[in-house]
């Protein structure tokens, strides 16, 4: 019973996230957090342009609140909007920017490398950008742009790596763009820190002590 409820909760979370992403795509949707409380459900939206989410006189945020309550059966939803401080280090926003660049006619290498350079300049410890589809020619293939360390599976991937995905709609077909960024404050299990050892030098004392001169009376 608990397992079924866990699965249902995760499915609902994914559906809510997808709905909010589509509703706030033009605001630079960077992800969401959903947490139940004794007073209802707190939903935090991370976006690049908060004003577009709230809407004039708060109309848009009211509409989303009603939809979450009626369509998704979210109990007393309370939406909070937070601005993303560094959009280029948010994988969802970064993947959307790359997708938009491709739709504008950018070459996939230029789009991937431009985004990667921005992340490196912002001191991202690890980045993986993957652009897949008919990026050159008729055959579908994928191109990766990498820097630093990144994890694909296990606990480090779940808790240490943030993920974003977007699609670019081109005449040749759909191009998928995925971005993985290692959190700057996350320490990987294979990271070994070698601390310098402080060696205290022993000074041999042979019993020789300097004595002050004594005067004869």
Curated annotation (Swiss-Prot):
Coiled coil: none
InterPro entries to which the protein is assigned, alphabetical: KH_dom, KH_dom-like_a/b, KH_dom_type_2, KH_sf_prok-type, Ribosomal_S3_C_sf, Ribosomal_uS3_arc, Ribosomal_uS3_C, Ribosomal_uS3_CS
Domain of life: Archaea
Protein transport found in the keyword field: no
Keyword rRNA-binding belongs to the record: yes
Species per Swiss-Prot/TrEMBL record: Picrophilus torridus (strain ATCC 700027 / DSM 9790 / JCM 10055 / NBRC 100828 / KAW 2/3)
Biological role stated in the UniProt entry: Binds the lower part of the 30S subunit head.
Entry similarity comment: Belongs to the universal ribosomal protein uS3 family.
GO biological process, one term: translation
Keywords noted in UniProt: Ribonucleoprotein, Ribosomal protein, RNA-binding, rRNA-binding
Recorded GO CC terms: cytosolic small ribosomal subunit
One annotated GO molecular function: rRNA binding
Subunit: Part of the 30S ribosomal subunit.
Domain KH type-2, residue spans: 16-85
Gene designation: rps3
Protein name in UniProt: Small ribosomal subunit protein uS3
């Amino acid at each position: 019973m608990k397992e079924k409820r866990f699965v249902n909760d995760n499915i609902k979370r994914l559906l809510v996230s997808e709905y909010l992403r589509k509703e706030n795509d033009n605001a630079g949707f960077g992800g969401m957090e959903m947490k139940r409380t004794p007073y209802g459900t707190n939903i935090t939206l991370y976006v690049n342009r908060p004003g577009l989410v709230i809407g004039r006189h708060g109309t848009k945020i009211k509409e989303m609140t009603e939809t979450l309550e009626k369509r998704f059966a979210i109990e007393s939803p309370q939406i909070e909007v937070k601005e993303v401080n560094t959009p280029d280090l948010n994988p969802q926003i970064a993947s959307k920017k790359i997708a938009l660049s491709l739709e504008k006619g950018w070459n996939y290498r230029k789009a991937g490398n431009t985004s990667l350079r921005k992340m490196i300049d912002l001191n991202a410890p690890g980045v993986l950008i993957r652009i897949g589809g008919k990026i050159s020619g008729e055959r579908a293939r994928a191109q990766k742009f990498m820097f630093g360390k990144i994890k694909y599976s296990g606990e480090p991937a779940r808790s240490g790596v943030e993920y974003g995905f977007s699609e670019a709609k081109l005449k040749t077909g759909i191009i998928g763009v995925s971005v993985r960024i290692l959190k700057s404050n996350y320490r990987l299990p294979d990271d070994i820190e070698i601390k310098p050892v402080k060696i205290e030098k022993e000074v041999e004392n042979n019993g020789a002590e300097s004595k002050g001169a004594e005067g004869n009376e």
